């Protein structure tokens, strides 16, 4: 063991050791993250930080440099899909796509050098508190480090369903704090010290004192997680809804040699077929049919002066199909479209586009809509106008103005005959919309109209918004939703790990709010997630597939959770109080030296 230790010490002096540290943290972080989800590796992944912080202790420029390199390696391994996105979405050459990945690692991996420099500084000044310094610096880097695709160390640990329950109280940041505390404790418990700990009574006492508080913290999180899991597992739902998710695998563009009409016709027929097949598997009429973001790309079902004359985006056959699905099953249909409006006085310069979700009630009437508020930089807008010339496929979207919930409805029947009422002859289908205009389609179903009543409200999120815990909290001003619906289009990333990561990052919102989530994606991964963060029925759709997912979801009636009301209060409070404590210690140390 001593010989091995000596060799490792010699290895630490080489540049190869630095590369070893980059790869250690990058690889073990990837293995702990979705889709591999070997969560236990998260506890040793930060070792690379600790090794380099010891090697370059007090050398802040080198720590900053090596922290940046860890960020680049982490991004290259875990977020390699950025290359695919840059090529597919931005139409950039392969070399430029690689440069974009490297730039993303440098810019959005800043939390790594922030951790290493702050940890080196504080642990050098306050050595006996190093384990808590690790937690403090880890939390600090998570809270202030800039990110485009926000992920946190707590997300990696939240693959453990018990630890994940603590997100209701501490948010993901609290779990990140735990990760760094436990990781540094394990780091200092390495095999090199076992011999002296075993043979020395004094060393054993020191070690027990060292691990006592971290062990108690871990135990607290485990006990709290078990308590919260049992508490919410025993909560009885107030009602259930039959939900049908349609994953149509719509094309990103029409560049495969077929006519646009042929491609879009095939897509609309596929949506109708998937809905019918999903309803058959459900065995009863759905209450809610959910289509994904860009499930019908490039078009709008909103007939306005702007979408019909200024920009011809409205397509009556799109409008008709959504109307037909609502009436065929007397269900709510929630779907995505492109909408447009003027920002200020009507003029070409003031024309704006919106990523819009809208609900049609069981009569096919247009009801509430939600316009995406948190837009993705480089995807839905560019920070500077000249960048549009480099990526002409990037959208020019305007953020929505409100955090609003979506109301959904239930048809009210007063007699059996009224419930079984059907249109004259037969139900219309997609092919009929070629000969029936939208007004004719509505007229055809006029006799089947029924009274509907508002049943409840749900929280709508579009794509990227679901991975932003602070943003999702802002909907609390709109009321207490019954469940969450997330519409997403991840097709830009191909069959990469991004879809699994997107799903995993969004899963914690169900725990934070204690609400079930319906997640409908264009090309995968679609699923229903319960209020404990579990996949309902252990069902998920595949990637790059067209399929439907039918499931009954539960509605939990409970007041807003601690996290919903207070957000990251506990992590910020921990950071503030610990910071005050360390500042006081540093001042005391400085005064002691001057005396």
Curated annotation (Swiss-Prot):
One of its GO terms (cellular component) is plasma membrane. Pathway: Protein modification; lipoprotein biosynthesis (N-acyl transfer). The chain crosses the membrane at residues 30-50, 63-83, 95-115, 167-187, 210-230, 569-589. It is a multi-pass membrane protein. Catalyzes the phospholipid dependent N-acylation of the N-terminal cysteine of apolipoprotein, the last step in lipoprotein maturation. Belongs to the CN hydrolase family. Apolipoprotein N-acyltransferase subfamily. This is Apolipoprotein N-acyltransferase 2. The lineage of its organism: Bacteria, Pseudomonadati, Spirochaetota, Spirochaetia, Leptospirales.
């Amino acid at each position: 063991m001593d010989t091995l230790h000596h060799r490792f010490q010699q290895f630490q002096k080489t540049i190869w050791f630095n590369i070893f540290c980059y790869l250690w943290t990058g690889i073990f972080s990837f293995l702990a993250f979705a889709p591999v989800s070997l969560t236990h590796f998260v506890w040793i992944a930060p070792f690379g930080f600790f090794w380099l912080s010891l090697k370059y202790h007090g050398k802040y420029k080198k720590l900053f440099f090596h922290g940046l390199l860890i960020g680049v390696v982490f991004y290259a391994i875990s977020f390699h899909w950025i290359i695919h996105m840059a090529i597919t979405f931005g139409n950039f050459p392969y070399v430029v796509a690689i440069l974009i990945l490297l730039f993303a690692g440098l810019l959005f991996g800043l939390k790594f050098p922030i951790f290493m420099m702050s940890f080196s500084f504080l642990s050098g000044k306050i050595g006996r508190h190093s384990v808590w310094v690790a937690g403090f610096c880890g939390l600090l880097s998570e809270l202030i480090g800039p990110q485009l695709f926000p992920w946190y160390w707590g997300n990696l640990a939240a693959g453990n369903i018990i630890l994940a329950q603590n997100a209701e109280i501490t948010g993901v940041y609290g779990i990140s704090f735990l990760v760094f505390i436990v990781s540094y404790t394990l780091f200092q418990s390495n095999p090199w010290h076992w011999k002296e700990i075993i043979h020395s009574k004094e060393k054993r006492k020191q070690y027990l004192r060292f691990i006592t508080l971290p062990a108690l913290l871990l135990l607290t999180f485990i006990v709290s997680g078990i308590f919260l899991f049992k508490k919410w597992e025993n909560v009885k739902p107030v009602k259930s809804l039959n939900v049908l998710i349609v994953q149509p695998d719509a094309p990103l563009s029409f560049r495969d040699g077929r006519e646009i009409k042929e491609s879009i016709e095939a897509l609309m027929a596929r949506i109708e077929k998937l809905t019918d097949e999903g309803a058959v598997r459900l065995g009863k009429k759905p209450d809610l049919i959910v289509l994904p973001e860009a499930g019908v790309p490039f078009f709008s079902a909103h007939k306005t002066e702007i979408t019909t004359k200024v920009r011809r985006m409205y397509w009556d056959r799109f409008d008709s199909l959504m109307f037909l699905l609502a009436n065929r099953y007397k269900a709510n249909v929630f779907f995505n479209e492109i909408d447009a409006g003027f920002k200020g006085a009507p003029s070409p310069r003031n024309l704006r586009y919106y990523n819009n979700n809208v609900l049609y009630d069981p009569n096919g009437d247009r009801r509430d809509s939600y316009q995406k508020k948190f837009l993705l930089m480089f995807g839905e807008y560019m920070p500077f106008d000249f960048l549009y010339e480099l990526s002409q496929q990037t959208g020019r979207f305007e953020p929505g103005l409100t955090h609003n919930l979506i109301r959904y409805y239930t048809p009210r029947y007063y007699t059996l005959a009224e419930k079984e009422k059907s249109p004259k002859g037969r139900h219309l289908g997609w092919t009929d919309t070629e000969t029936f205009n939208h007004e004719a389609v509505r007229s055809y179903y006029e006799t089947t109209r029924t009274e509907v009543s508002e049943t409840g409200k749900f929280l709508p999120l579009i794509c990227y918004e679901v991975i932003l815990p602070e943003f999702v909290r802002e909907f609390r001003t709109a009321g207490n939703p019954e469940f969450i619906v997330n519409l997403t289009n991840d097709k830009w990333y191909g069959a990469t790990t991004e879809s699994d990561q997107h799903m995993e990052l969004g899963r914690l919102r169900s725990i934070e709010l204690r609400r079930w989530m319906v997640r409908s994606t264009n090309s995968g991964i679609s699923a229903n997630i319960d209020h404990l963060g579990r996949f309902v029925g252990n069902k998920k759709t595949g990637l790059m597939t067209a399929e439907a997912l039918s499931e009954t979801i539960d509605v939990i009636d409970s007041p807003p959770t601690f996290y919903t009301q207070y957000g990251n209060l506990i992590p910020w409070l921990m950071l503030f109080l610990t910071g005050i404590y360390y500042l006081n210690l540093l001042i005391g140390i400085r005064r002691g030296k001057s005396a």
